[in-house]
Amino acid sequence: KAVLEAFNATEVEYKVNLTRKAAREWFSGNLSFEFNASPPQRPGRPDKPELIAPQDMPRRRNAKARAARIAMLHAIAHIELNAIDLALDIVVRFGADMPKEFTDDWIKVADDEARHFSMLNNLLIEFDSFYGAMPAHDGLWQSASTTSHDLLARLAIVPLVLEARGLDVTPAMIKK
């Protein structure tokens, strides 16, 4: 229930806090996961960012410019928010059929991604911006939807291909 509540949360800080709390409770043995809930088709999301088609995303020009840095931080924060939901979804959707260690690993992934999102969101705030200030695309979650019936496809497509590609195709990220 705690994992599903985090998945459904629509406010990002609340989602992060619920995810981190669920991880602490899971690893301290205070959370019993009964795997009797099925996740909705989409995670809870805030009203912003506006989700647009990947081909309609604005191009980032000068990576040294403040606006380009904010855009890059926002894009990475969006990937991390999706990664939280992908990890939570995989626990709820496939955990009942897997050993406990599977759930342990994916709860840890969700906790790590929540921590990463928080760090990026704090950087955005330092730049006088915030998560949701810029548009984003829904490609990661669309792939999750198409693999919702098949654990192996999900494990191959989403974390190994799309998330890595999302981080690797940015020239400034490759350089760093």
Please describe what each predicted stretch is:
Residues 1-176:
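Non-heme di-metal
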